[in-house]
Each structure stands twice: as C-alpha cells, then as structure tokens.
C-alpha cells in the first residue's frame, strides 16, 4: 500500500517539475518573440517611406508609395497586434499544460515574423532603388545631353566625310533624341526606374554614335579612295609587266584583284548602313593581300634582273669547269705513266664528265624557257640556284681529284720516311732484347715480330713497283706501322715481366729452406722462367712466398725500382 502511495507521489512531483520546466521554456521563447515584434515596431520604416515624398508623386512612384504605406499600416495595425494576442494565447496554453498547442502557435508566430522581415527588406530595397534611380538620373542626364549636342555638331561638321552613311547617322541621332524625350516623360510621371532604363539605352546608343563618328570617315577614305587607287596601280603594274614579257599567269593576280574588289564593294555597302563590326580587320586583310601581290611583282622584277646578270656568268663558269676537267684528265694520263691509279679514280672522272654534260643540257633548257617566257622569272631563278649547286658540287669534286693527284708524290715521300722509321724501330727493339739479358722471348711474341718484319718488307717492295699503286702502298704502311708499334709495346712489357720474375725468384730463395713445398714451387718458377713463361713464373714464385710474407709482389717491385 505504501509503495503505491509513494509511487503516485513520485509521479506527481515529476509531472509538476516537468511542467514547470516546459512552461519556463515557453515563457522564454514568448519573451524572445515579443522582443522581435517590438523591434519591428520601432524601426524607422515610415522615415524610409517618407523619402519617396520628395519625388514626383505620380505614376509609378505614387503607386509604390501607396502600396508601401498600406503594407506598413497593415503590419502595424493588424498583423503585429494579432501576434500580440497569439503570444498571450501561448502563455495561456502553457499554464494549462497544453504544450503541443503552445508549440504549434509559437511556430506560426515565428513564421509570420519571418514573413514580415522579408516583406520589409524587399520594401526598403525597392525604396532605395527608386530614390537612387532618381538621384542617378538627375546626375547623369546633364552629361548625356552634352554628349548628344556634341555629337549632333560633329555629325554636321563631318557630314561630307560621312558620305552615304550621313542619313543613317541622322536616324541614330533622332533615335537617341526620342529616348531622351521618353526619359523626360517617365521622369515627369514619377517612373524613375523606367526612366533609368531608357537613359542607359540612350547612353549606349550615343556611345556607339561617338565611336562610329571617329572611325567611319577613315573607313570611307580606305574603301572609296586608298584601296581603289592601290588596285588601279596594281592593275597597271600587272599590265606593264605582261607587256614587258613577264609570265604572270601562274600567280592568278587578276582573279585575286576581282575578289578584293568584290569584297571592297561589299564592305562599302555595310559601311553605308554603319555595320562596322570587324570591318577594320577586313580592310587590313585587303591591304595586306595587295601588299603581298606588289611584293610578288617586285620579286619577279628582281628575279629577271638577277637572271640577266647570272646566266652569262654561269655559262662562263660551266665552260671553265669543263676546261678544268679536261686538264685533270690530261694530267691523270701523265701520272699513270709512273703511278698505278685506282680504277675508282678513273670511273669517278668519267662520271664527272657525264654530270657536266647534263648540266650543259639543263642550262640550255633554262635558256629556252627564259627566252620563250614560259615560266615566271622567280621559278627560273630557283632552277638556276639549284643548277648552280650542282655545278659547285662538280667543281669541288674536280678540285678534290686534282689535290689527290698532287698529293701522290707527297704520299710517296711520306711513305718512304715512315718505312725508314719503322726499320729503325725494329733495330732498336732488337738491341733492347740483347741488352736485357733475358733467357728468351715467348713463341707467340716471336711470331708477331716476324709478322711485323714481313709487313714492312711487303710495304718496301710495293713502294718499288712501277707503276706505283699508292693506295695499296699506304694501306701496307699503315698495317706495318700498327703491327710494329703494337709488338714494341708487348716486347717492352715482356722484358719488364722477365726482370720482375727474376727478382721475385731471387727474393724467394730466402724462404727455400722453410719447407719442401716452398722449394718445389720456387724450382717450378725457375723452370717456367727458363721456358720464357714469365707470367706463370711470377705467379708460382708469389704462391711460394706469400705464406711467409704478404704483398710480396708489391715489395719486390718497389725494391727493383
């Protein structure tokens, strides 16, 4: 029984505590919304609306003013008082523990206050836009009208230079005037925002007119005067050159000029109605195209002048080159009496003769083409440049062949001197072997030395042949020289190894009595030494000594100096 009573008591206390906490939370939220409502009431919205009274109260301005004032009156007189009543209802619901209804009503009140905030923000922003539009219009209209008057005067002053576009300028200026009149009308009616839009349109149009007044006169000069004059000059120059014998059909300049003239007429029509976008680039293209054609004609004239001078000189150069080849052949026949020339040299000279013959035929073709005016002079000049490269190549080949003949005797004397030096080298190496007192030389080295002497003998014998085949002599001398010098290097190395082997064996004798194995290895090293196997002798002696003394080879080398 007491447990039941105690449980009921606990539940009752818990309920009252929970209710007290919830009511406190609702009261706190009611106070917050009450402060928000009062903040809205205290805002200077009437002052913001009152700014509009300084404007012309008609049309759009008057309509907006009445709407804003009505909205504010509705907020102050109807909506916010209703919010006040709803806040009292929330407190009543909370006191009666009707928490769900209290929460729902609070959410509704908060949503209404948010809606009022959004409505007031839009209202204030619109008022600022309206007032600022009036101020901006009043500030800018003066400079816009000044620009209008300035452009009207410029259009009158430059009327002659505006050519056929003058009427279109008049229409654009009239359009600008109509826009400014519309601006005045909207301003007088209090439609300041509409007036601002019209003023921006007028400013943009006047800016276009100002830009066009700057560029159009110059464009007319280009299209009506400069370009036609240049095309006429180009046409006259083309006619004069054709009459002077220039072949210009390849360049198709006539058709290019027709296309440029068609483009000029098209641009002139566009300029008349002031459609100028990209026109300067189009005019630049026409002028660059004409400049390229003028340069093309100038290059043709230059090419003709160069050809007039170049052709006789090239004919003379070809004749001199043919004479040089004839002299080369005669000298070759003379040299063949003493020297045997390689077959390739004779074939090479025959090939040179064919090449010069082909160059002679090509030059005749170029002469005919030039005289009959079948090609442009610039293309003929290119042919001549290529032809001259071929002639230069032949001249270089003839000079090389001539130098080869001149160097034959020089090569012979050089070969004799080299053979003499090789003989002395062999004698020097033999004396070195005798002085070295080594037991002998390995069989492989003896064979190499014998091969070197044979190569030397072959070269000496070949140098005595008549007729002399100098190419073969040079090859044999080079072979003998390479082999003898290589043998000399191997010989010096072998002598040094023999001396080192002898020193190592002598050094090792101090350890001969240490063991039978040491004695045996040193004896084997001596046998290898006497058999001229010096590398093996060194290795065997070192193996015998190293158990007693490390790095013996380096020590012996140091002692031997």
Curated annotation (Swiss-Prot):
List the keywords (alphabetical).
Answer: Cell cycle, Cell division, Cell membrane, Coiled coil, Membrane, Septation, Transmembrane, Transmembrane helix
Q: Which residues form a coiled coil?
A: 98-130, 166-214, 251-465
The cross-references to Pfam families, in alphabetical order and at most eight, read: EzrA
Segments passing through the bilayer: 4-22
What domain of life? Bacteria
* UniProt subcellular location: Cell membrane
By what name is this protein known? Septation ring formation regulator EzrA
Instruction: Name the species this protein comes from.
Output: Halalkalibacterium halodurans (strain ATCC BAA-125 / DSM 18197 / FERM 7344 / JCM 9153 / C-125)
Q: What is the primary gene name for this protein?
A: ezrA
